[in-house]
């Protein structure tokens, strides 16, 4: 549980913060809920049951990631408002066009991938397992993936530390992410 994901955004009064709850079984998230109190939007998923969005007390809407027709004209990438943009752009191949979408909360950025509003969220910097467990369930149930930047799945309660490695949230796994994000094998 993370009662305040996006603490700096909360302090700055940007509205880009969330409350996160996850259930992890056998080192893998099986349930996730993300609530944005300012927008009133809730995202949730349960393993095998799909991913859903409740926009401001309305009816639940099933969500899914965006799939591209190749060649794609542009890749939308959610980025942190607080991160050095050059650190991100150095990782991007010049062969593609990008729309960078700044946002605060890590959970809300991952949920944008889950609902197909952006294609990717690249996180280079410290986060805890509590920042990704709920959104991993939501993203996976929506058809996406959350992987380390070495392209291995994130795991929970298996390391000596609860800190995550750098990671990427991918909507369309069929895109050539090794090329797009200049990932070295």
Describe the residue ranges of each PLM region.
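Short loop->beta-strand "edge-of-pocket" segments that line small-molecule binding or catalytic clefts
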Residues: 66-87, 94-104
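DPxDG-like acidic metal-binding loop motif
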Residues: 1-52
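Short secondary-structure boundary/capping segments
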Residues: 34, 66-69, 92, 158-160
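Oxyanion/phosphate-interacting regions
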Residues: 90-94, 109-185
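Short Pro/Gly-enriched coil loops immediately N-terminal to beta-strands
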Residues: 35, 45-46, 70-71, 161-165
């Amino acid at each position: 549980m993370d009662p305040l994901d996006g603490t700096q955004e909360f302090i700055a009064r940007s509205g880009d913060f969330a409350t996160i709850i996850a259930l992890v079984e056998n080192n893998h998230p099986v349930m996730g809920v993300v609530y944005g109190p300012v927008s009133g939007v809730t995202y949730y998923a349960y393993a095998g049951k799909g991913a859903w969005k409740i926009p401001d007390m309305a009816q639940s809407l099933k969500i899914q990631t965006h799939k591209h027709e190749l060649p794609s004209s542009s890749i939308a990438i959610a980025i942190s408002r607080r991160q050095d943009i050059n650190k991100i752009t150095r990782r991007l191949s010049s062969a593609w066009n990008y729309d960078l979408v700044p946002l605060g909360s890590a959970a809300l950025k991952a949920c944008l991938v889950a609902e197909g509003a952006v294609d990717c969220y690249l996180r280079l910097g410290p986060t805890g397992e509590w920042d990704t467990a709920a959104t991993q369930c939501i993203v996976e149930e929506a058809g996406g993936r959350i992987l380390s930047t070495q392209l291995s799945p994130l795991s929970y309660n298996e390391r000596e530390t609860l800190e995550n490695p750098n990671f990427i949230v991918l909507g369309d796994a069929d895109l050539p992410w090794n090329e797009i994000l200049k990932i070295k094998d």
